């Protein structure tokens, strides 16, 4: 099968590799669309960071159709439109027994340990394959993976109906977060973002207020908008010292601060504001992937409650992937979610 295989920094090759074998509990999926995550681009430019077994096909956001099922698999058949978990948990450890599959120490992740979705076929365990509801397109289904990350983050935040939210950064993750926060019944949803086009998109996705941090102080303005005391929950969707600072100090006392962004283009490490945490009794939390949340998101998209497909800005042919990655740095602020058309 054809795959985009990462070998080293700025060295990705379209190659023929063996198709995945199908075990008794496996499902072989013909990939139709694969989403490009910023982690894929960072790996291409600066890896190895998360790739443990190069050369390896990257990609963990995808949709497709069932090509083949193992002998123990029921409920799925060839031709079914699906998406699924891009990793193999062990299903047996203490974390898996609590449905915390994303924390399984021996999980084998697509695009990290085994070939990912930048390929014509990808294998999944049947327990992590979700058939798409009628009316959900394969294009939109390819955005369910990042939406599941965001959905879990909002769940972990304990967001209550009517509470205020501040989202720092309106890339795909921040935009999806606005959409999920709206669905969850948040009151004021404030989004800080310097790009005009992304602020406009944030309003379409559920934001009630948008701020340009290059023109106005997002900390002061968020306090003013949110009862004079700040947001109940803030999310840093960028991952730099400056954006974390904004998220922290725009949050009211006894509030919660979620960390979803990695500052790949600056420093991937930054100080946690411990003094602020003590002084204001903040709760910090981070989110690693998702588990049962993906099934919930599939159902919500099917019901029209969430609209993750609205973040798609470009669809490019699979054979243009290397050229796209080569020029991503100079153009990255122009894009939202990019899909590869593979099948």
Positions of the model-derived regions?
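Glycine-rich cofactor phosphate-binding loops and adjacent beta1-alpha1 units
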Residues: 157, 203-283
């Amino acid at each position: 099968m054809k795959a985009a295989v990462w070998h080293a920094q700025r060295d990705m090759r379209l190659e023929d590799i063996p198709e995945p074998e199908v075990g008794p509990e496996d499902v072989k999926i013909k990939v139709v669309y694969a989403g490009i995550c910023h982690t894929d681009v960072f790996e291409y430019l600066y890896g190895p960071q998360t790739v443990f077994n190069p050369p390896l096909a990257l990609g963990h956001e995808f949709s497709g159709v069932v090509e083949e099922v193992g002998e123990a698999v029921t409920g799925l058949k060839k031709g079914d439109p699906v998406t699924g978990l891009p990793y193999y948990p062990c299903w047996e450890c203490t974390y898996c027994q609590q449905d915390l599959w994303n924390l399984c120490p021996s999980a084998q992740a697509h695009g990290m340990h085994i070939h990912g979705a930048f390929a014509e076929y990808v294998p999944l365990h049947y327990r992590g394959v979700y058939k798409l509801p009628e009316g959900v397109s394969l294009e939109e289904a390819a955005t369910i993976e990042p939406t599941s990350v965001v959905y879990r983050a909002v769940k972990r935040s304990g967001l209550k109906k009517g509470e205020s939210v501040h989202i720092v950064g309106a890339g795909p993750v921040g935009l999806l977060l606005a959409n999920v926060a709206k669905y969850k019944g948040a009151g004021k949803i404030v989004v800080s973002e310097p790009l005009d086009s992304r602020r406009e998109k944030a309003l379409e996705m559920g934001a009630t207020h948008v701020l340009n941090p290059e023109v106005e102080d997002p900390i002061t303005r968020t306090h003013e908008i949110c009862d004079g005391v700040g947001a109940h929950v803030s999310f840093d969707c960028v991952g730099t010292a400056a954006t974390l600072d904004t998220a922290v100090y725009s949050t009211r006392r006894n509030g919660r601060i979620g960390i979803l962004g990695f500052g790949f283009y600056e420093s991937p490490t930054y100080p946690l504001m411990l003094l602020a945490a003590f002084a204001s009794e903040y709760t910090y939390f981070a989110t690693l992937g998702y588990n049962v949340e993906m099934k919930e998101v599939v159902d919500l998209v099917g019901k029209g409650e969430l609209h993750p497909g609205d973040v798609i800005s470009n669809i490019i042919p699979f054979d243009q992937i290397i050229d796209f990655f080569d020029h991503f740095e100079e153009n990255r602020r122009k894009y939202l979610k990019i899909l590869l058309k593979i099948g």
